[in-house]
Design a protein with these regions (language model features):
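Outer-membrane beta-barrel proteins
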Residues: 15, 61, 80, 105-107, ...
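Outer-membrane beta-barrel translocator domains and adjoining extracellular loop/strand segments
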Residues: 142-147, 177, 182-189
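Short gly/pro/ser/thr-enriched loop/turn and capping motifs at secondary-structure boundaries
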Residues: 137-140
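Transmembrane beta-barrel outer-membrane domains
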Residues: 22, 87, 101, 108-112, ...
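Transmembrane beta-barrel wall of Gram-negative outer-membrane proteins
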Residues: 107, 111-135, 147-180
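A short, compositionally biased micro-patch
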Residues: 20-22, 32, 87, 111, ...
Length: 191
């Protein structure tokens, strides 16, 4: 509750984890800096899990990861696994759900700041596809109320997994985000 479908807000409720001001998702673990955390998705390090991040921080106002696809999140505030070094404060290791093997599942949603479309479907008897795309609509709301900035964010997550045999599988993972600010020249100037 209160996380607005954002994994960083959920993480801030863990013991020893704090945050900064309410509009950002910076993670402060046991007094370390926000840039001292490491994030992994399916064993691959991702440099940031938030939109509109700033240099020297791990947070931004909105998360990149689609929570519909998160199966688990392992959290280490000390005694990091040997393959997860180079972190001073914490390590977060996210795992994705398994793709549907029987029938396609499509989900569309409207959140507090974005619209999204997710697809979880079998491709062949031995393969599956997870696909998600999101786009913000804040720029339209901010324009209507006359704010001087118009933020837009987009992100996509895709994983194609094929089972080669009983012991081997091959996965292709894509995660991407694009953020943009525009000035609202139609906004009234404040004094």
């Amino acid at each position: 509750a209160g996380a607005n479908r954002d994994i960083s807000k959920v993480i801030q409720s863990l013991p020893g984890v704090g945050g900064t001001v309410s509009f950002r998702n910076d993670l402060i673990v046991r007094g370390g800096g926000p840039s001292e955390n490491r994030f992994y998705l399916e064993g691959i390090e991702i440099p940031n899990i938030n939109h509109f991040s700033t240099q020297g921080a791990s947070g931004g106002p909105v998360g990149i990861l689609n929570v519909d696809f998160i199966k688990s999140a392992d959290y280490y505030s000390s005694a990091f696994p040997s393959g997860r070094g180079n972190a001073l404060s914490s390590v977060f290791d996210f795992k994705l759900i398994e793709g549907n093997k029987d029938k396609p599942s499509v989900r569309a949603s409207v959140g507090a700041s974005e619209i999204s479309l997710s697809l979880n479907t079998p491709v062949t008897e031995n393969s599956s596809l997870l696909f998600s795309v999101r786009r913000s609509y804040l720029q339209f709301l901010f324009s209507q109320i006359g704010l001087p900035f118009l933020p837009t964010f987009n992100d996509a997550t895709t994983r194609y997994k094929v089972k080669l045999n009983k012991k081997n599988e091959l996965s292709f993972l894509f995660i991407g985000a694009y953020d943009q600010f525009k000035l609202n020249f139609d906004a009234e100037q404040t004094e």
